[in-house]
From Swiss-Prot:
SUPFAM superfamilies recorded: Ribokinase-like
Function: Pyridoxal kinase involved in the salvage pathway of pyridoxal 5'-phosphate (PLP). Catalyzes the phosphorylation of pyridoxal to PLP.
InterPro entries (alphabetical): PM/HMP-P_kinase-1 (IPR013749), PyrdxlKinase (IPR004625), Pyridoxal_kinase_PdxY (IPR023685), Ribokinase-like (IPR029056)
Family: Belongs to the pyridoxine kinase family. PdxY subfamily.
Full protein name: Pyridoxal kinase PdxY
GO CC field: cytosol
PANTHER family in UniProt: PYRIDOXAL KINASE
Cofactor dependence: Mg(2+)
Origin species: Histophilus somni (strain 2336)
EC number: 2.7.1.35
Keyword terms, alphabetized: ATP-binding, Kinase, Magnesium, Nucleotide-binding, Transferase
GO biological process: pyridoxal 5'-phosphate salvage
Length: 286
């Protein structure tokens, strides 16, 4: 069994961060070590929430605690998502380095959550800069959305061709794999939900249906990053993991849409997480 240290947010009500990613990864046979960067009543896109940011020291203390009992070498990967403070970025990288000392084969997936003010997604000052200046170069895999793709690459990215250039720029900065979670308005077809995968062997594009919600569910990116990493650890190739992830997320979104609710319906879609009914295929474009 593979083990992932998943360092991201926790919400008591609803689905975002670890709450969105942990159960699907467990369904895929992964033992998830969930370390929460914040504990909130609900996700920030409700516009109001209660809770706290976990003190930055706790990240290192908890990782050290696992090391103290001699089990840190079992960690196969680190996944970071929503980060509660700029200081936490450095602590996460320190934690990854300690894990690499115990298991040189361990990998790091950075889901570079930078916030989206238009959607009400709020992150602390300095987090974006830490992700760009510190985390990106350390990550084996990085999973930006369109906003984050622009920030990480330093390019405007106003069309599909520029998105291709942006992923190439990011590959040159350290990551070995770039998964663009949603191309949004720079995709080929505005009526589809489109994603990109890039590695040193090429670039792949996949399209699936775009489900229209009155209020777009939160936690989809967290689900996407977790599924992709879990699939890789389970031995799938990059493209196989990409396809399984896109198809699973589509099935979760369809289940959520059919239920007519705001929060992701990962439990209701559990069957499709293991064996997705969608069968969309990635196309190599570069």
């Amino acid at each position: 069994m593979k083990n992932i240290l998943s360092i991201q947010s926790h919400v008591v009500y609803g689905y975002a961060g670890n709450k969105s990613a942990t159960f699907p990864m467990q369904l895929l046979g992964i033992d998830v070590w969930a370390l929460n960067t914040v504990q909130f009543s609900n996700h920030t896109q409700y516009g109001k929430w209660t809770g706290m940011v976990i003190p930055k020291e706790q990240i290192g203390e908890i990782v050290q605690g696992i090391d103290n009992i001699g089990e840190l070498h079992q960690c196969d990967a680190v996944l970071s998502g929503y980060i509660g403070s700029a200081e936490q970025v450095e602590e996460i990288i320190k934690a990854f380095h300690k894990i690499k000392e115990r298991n040189p084969k361990a990998i790091y997936l950075c889901d570079p959550v930078m916030g989206h003010p238009d959607k009400g997604c709020v992150v602390a000052d300095g987090v974006k800069e830490g992700l760009i200046k510190i985390a990106m170069a350390q990550a084996d895999i990085i999973t930006p959305n369109l906003v984050e793709l622009r920030e990480l690459s330093g390019l405007a990215v106003e069309n599909f061709e520029q998105a291709i250039e942006a992923v190439k720029v990011i590959l040159s900065k350290g990551p070995k794999k770039v998964l663009v979670k949603h191309l949004s308005r720079v995709g080929k077809n505005a009526a589809q939900f489109e994603m990109l995968l890039a590695n040193n062997d090429g670039i792949w594009h996949i399209s699936r249906p775009l489900h229209n919600f009155n209020k777009e569910p939160v936690g989809v990116g967290d689900l996407t990053a977790g599924l992709f990493l879990a699939n890789l650890l389970n031995g799938k190739s990059d493209v196989e993991a990409f396809e399984h992830t896109a198809n699973t997320v589509n099935d979760v979104m369809e289940t959520t849409h059919n239920a007519g609710v705001y929060e992701l319906q990962t439990i209701a879609a559990r069957e499709w997480i293991v064996n997705p009914k969608s069968q969309y295929k990635a196309v190599k474009i570069g």
